[in-house]
């Protein structure tokens, strides 16, 4: 299988904002390499050992629990009040204290009720717009990022999930009946549908292609439940399958250049089937097509032993640490009930354990707290009341948790002199920090800083270009030696510090280090005092 590979040779520009940025040279070794020991034997250096923080929630990008919401009629306007006073097996808790993201999943017609009219615009006051603002404002107040999925297919729904203006413009589609209600869905290969949907996604990206606010955008919005399976094409067969996949994947990759995009690695991706054991090679090829355009991966049937089985596990293994994984459980307590016994589960506590175990096997970065309009039942309630230990265990062990257990730095240097620093990094989580996805393009880097001893602000920053955070996986520490000159550094007393910076934001801290002590308010890890002569 051809895996996506990314080579980044970027020159770091010098930015004099709050600090002077200086680059140097470095070399590295895996920790189990015997040559590593020589990297620590540096005259004039002191070796600083760091204790890890293993349990605290870290709101680092693309990891953690995803809190599900929505903008349909089932969403209550007091959602945040209910979730801030949520029942758990250990008493009342605030759900946001355990999550990193609010996931807003909704009908295209709710996001875009009229042509050119969107619920994020000022003055739009539909019920979905009111719910949307409530969720977005509440997320901001609680330090959560946003994530989105759009659904265009109306099957199993009680109203049209594609806006009426699309049908009125002449898009072709089909009718189905949900209960006593007839609903209409467009054919995904219809050119008018594609034109209108492309305009919606373009306008959405103009607003939300912003990693400071948005965690990810998930799926194509096509097929049953928006999960990219059971599609119905105008041809009556799967002939348009490849062309439609090429169209929508290229469109999203072009629009979302800064925010991760995610595709469901479904065995029937973009086909007319919901489940099938044939044609798996073609499905794999289509998923790879998306991966190679920069898509990350998700699946929506974790814990369901039929719909997530050997093929899904095998495909996930081929992409392990090449793309991050987001999981969603498949079983729904309110609708599936006793069906879980067919998978060998006696109750939903066992379902939660099954989902957790499957997620760990796939090295997922994010797990789901799905929504139910009755907060006293459903998946989120189940996690917090029958498996609260697993909620906390995922925070401690899932995703990525990065820290340098050992750093060798000089305690006395001369201005303009050469510095040699050895540093070793570990990942305590089972996932990985996906700096190799094109939307990030290795923007997160290791940096060392000379901090002002009074303010603890960086005066000089030195970015080590060589380490790739995506290479740090559990059980495989990475050691590096970084050499640079203190050209232009004024003499004085400073504090050595290390941080994981965002090079697109003037080297501000971008990822929290998982250290127990010694972190500044901004996230720099203090190492030792240093005198520059």
Predicted regions span which residues?
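Conserved, mostly hydrophobic/aromatic
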Residues: 102, 204, 217, 423, ...
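Extracellular/luminal regions of secreted and cell-surface proteins that mediate adhesion/ECM remodeling
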Residues: 396-533
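Aromatic-lined substrate-binding rim segments of carbohydrate-active enzymes
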Residues: 91-176, 241-260
